[in-house]
């Protein structure tokens, strides 16, 4: 088993200087490079045009420390196809161009989700119409970025907490077969992209949602549906990092080729929690990478809980230094 050197945690509280500018952060080698040295594919974060242009510190940190980018909002349905058949890609183009020009892998997020869905989609009641709309959306978005996206979150948050399938417009109108339709369409458009199913609250082995994900994915794989990976968002409360290892092992048992932590943030950003999560991925062979859901606390969707690796002044926090010192 690969283990972070937990003794390095002691260094965090013995005079760590966390108030220096970004260009004098402690890590002389990026945390992405350190993570890759353990055989993983990336340690990444998110971005979009607003956060990449609001100041110079945010993009500087991304360039220096992270190896992968996920668009926070610009590839979601409401951003890319607000009206039927009328696509707009200015925001997602900006993110993709930034990532490619700086040598970052890209995770496409997300093709099919019940939220941030335009009303014209959610109001469709005819099965054949919705299937046509679903296929066209996936095909158009993926075609634009074919060959540029490492992995796509094809389906996002389709499970209820009890492990059953959510009553979204896609499930209610098409039925469970929308899962097959979505993944087969995605595979036909870009055969080289990794295709993921992504969800939250997959953070504890034995939890009903984890069990539901595993059992459904096993069934879908047996039916030939081309699911390459399971994404665990991993939005954690304080102290929850220790359960992630067991959860990843459970998800890996579903039989996909890979799994990933896709939207990591942790209330309070304790060093112990972050190290536990990084260890969990290191110790699970199928876990290819971690995406932290934001660079600095002010831009976090849960900013009041200070869940990220950089503070309001874009200085590295103790959790960042825990990872940098221990990898």
From Swiss-Prot:
Residues 46-326 form the GH10 domain. One of its GO terms (molecular function) is endo-1,4-beta-xylanase activity. It is an enzyme of class 3 (hydrolase). The keyword Secreted applies. Pfam families: Glyco_hydro_10. GO terms for cellular component: extracellular region. Pathway: Glycan degradation; xylan degradation. Keywords: Carbohydrate metabolism, Disulfide bond, Glycosidase, Hydrolase, Polysaccharide degradation, Secreted, Signal, Xylan degradation. One of its GO terms (biological process) is xylan catabolic process. PROSITE patterns: GH10_1, GH10_2. It catalyses: Endohydrolysis of (1->4)-beta-D-xylosidic linkages in xylans. It is found in: Secreted. The active site is at residues 157, 263. Induction: Nucleotide sequences for binding catabolite repression protein CREA were detected in the promoter region. Its EC number is 3.2.1.8. SMART domains: Glyco_10 (SM00633). Coiled coil: none annotated. Disulfide bonds join 281-287. InterPro entries: GH10, GH10_AS, GH10_dom, Glycoside_hydrolase_SF. Residues 1-19 form the signal peptide. Endo-1,4-beta-xylanase involved in the hydrolysis of xylan, a major structural heterogeneous polysaccharide found in plant biomass representing the second most abundant polysaccharide in the biosphere, after cellulose. Belongs to the glycosyl hydrolase 10 (cellulase F) family. PANTHER family: ENDO-1,4-BETA-XYLANASE C, GLYCOSYL HYDROLASE. This is Endo-1,4-beta-xylanase A. It comes from Penicillium canescens. The gene is xylA.
